[in-house]
Design a protein with these regions (language model features):
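Pyridoxal 5′-phosphate
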Residues: 1-406
């Protein structure tokens, strides 16, 4: 049985106060808080097992290597990969997406080709493709969304053609909460011979993922949004594609042999993991995944849907408040503005009430442009939030509106 109060006991930071008020943390879309098991695992690694992986024959190195590869195997199972070799550890989702843009893109995208990017993407799934297009003389095409925040998949036939090489799309919008119809996107892309690159930062947290069922070619996410440490991310890639890709960075541990005449590379995934690995981050992320595997994804999703529904119903009763992203099936992300109230002012007042939300453009400036606004307030819920906190958000917004309109 899903017991949110018991879950909250596992997150030490949720018991602190800010400005003398209980912390109401509604910014998990930016970074999620960490359960005690992750905190203790990271601490133990620094205290007891601090040694480079894949490089030593001594006990500490070998033990750290075993834990690192076990984390890779656990994460592979969690996302539904066919094998652990399809999991590449990176510095984060941004690094994962750039790896594909440089390694796959430079090898397989040419002048006159096109790259399709959805309008609702985070900058990390826009800018690398723009940079690739500039390097290669390719065209960027944009798949728009409608006023409700639903992706216009009906326009795919007019945007995907025989020169489309990459389709970049989010599993769940970090601003609107929209979960696009990925099956339709993948089918259209694959019919044209294009690869599909999915930003899974929000999707992997809200409802989980099965990359083989999704049939995406690449899937990227960050550990810190999945209750894991910062500075660690994952790139899933179909093995046959990873094997065709040249390395993105050169250095130690990604090589097989090195001579001045020729260098040969390690097999996947190691050929994409140059340099000293963030083994603490990877093992910590494995522990976060282990934490998540204790729960039924359907129960997490039902809990978060209840939070979203309660907050939405309460906020809709506030005069002049607009919610952005009303497509059915959205995840637990709620962005809004109040007429006549700047989002930064709203965020500052909520902060003084102990409520942490995100304000600004959310690294999704094209979404702001679509709605003609310079910023939004965003509440993003997690498995440790409560209905009382959803009510606190609404009460805080009501109080802020009264203060700022008087």
């Amino acid at each position: 049985m899903f017991d949110v109060e018991k879950i909250r006991e596992e997150f030490p930071i949720l018991h602190r106060e800010v400005y003398g008020k209980p912390l109401v943390y509604l910014d998990s879309g930016a970074t999620a808080q960490k359960p005690r098991t992750v905190i203790e695992t990271v601490d133990r690694l620094h205290r007891e097992l601090n040694a480079n992986i894949h490089r030593g024959v001594h006990f500490l190195s070998e033990e750290a290597t075993v834990l690192y590869e076990a984390a890779r195997e656990r994460i592979a199972a969690f996302v539904g990969a066919a094998a652990k070799e399809e999991i590449v550890f990176t510095a984060g989702a941004t690094a994962s997406l750039n790896t594909v843009a440089y390694a796959w893109g430079d090898a397989f995208v040419g002048a006159g080709d096109n790259i399709l990017v959805s309008e609702m993407e985070h900058h990390s799934n826009i800018v690398p493709w723009q940079m690739l297009a500039e390097r290669k003389g390719a065209e960027i095409r944009v798949l728009p969304f409608d006023e409700a925040g639903a992706l216009r998949t009906d326009l795919l036939p007019s945007l995907v053609d025989e020169r489309t090489r990459v389709v970049a799309v989010t599993q769940a919008s970090n601003t609107l909460g929209t979960r696009p119809d990925l099956r339709t996107v993948v089918e259209a892309a694959h019919a044209a011979g294009a690869v599909v690159v999915v930003d899974g930062c929000q999707g992997v947290v809200h409802g989980g993922v099965d990359v083989r069922a999704m049939d995406c070619d690449f899937y990227a996410f960050s550990g810190h949004k999945l209750y894991g440490p910062t500075g660690i991310g994952v790139l899933y890639g179909k093995r046959e594609l990873l094997e065709r890709m040249p390395p993105f960075m050169g250095g130690g541990d990604m090589v097989d042999t090195v001579t001045f005449a020729k260098t040969t590379y390690a097999p996947v995934p190691l050929k994409f993991e140059a340099g000293t690995a963030n083994f603490v981050g990877a093992i910590g992320l494995g522990e976060a995944v282990k934490f998540m595997q204790r729960f039924d994804p359907a129960e997490i999703e039902a809990h978060e849907e209840a939070l979203l529904r309660r907050a939405t119903e309460r906020l809709e009763g506030i005069g002049g408040l607009r919610i952005y992203g009303t497509a059915p099936g959205k995840c637990a992300i709620l962005s809004f503005n109040v007429e006549g109230v700047h989002p930064y002012d709203m965020g500052m007042i909520l902060d003084k009430l102990g409520i942490a939300v995100r304000t600004g453009q959310h690294c999704a400036e094209p979404v702001m442009d679509h709605y003609g606004t310079t910023g939004m307030c965003r509440a993003s819920f997690a498995l440790y939030n409560t209905l009382a906190e959803a009510d606190a958000l609404a009460a805080g917004v009501e109080r802020a509106v009264k203060m700022l309109r008087n």
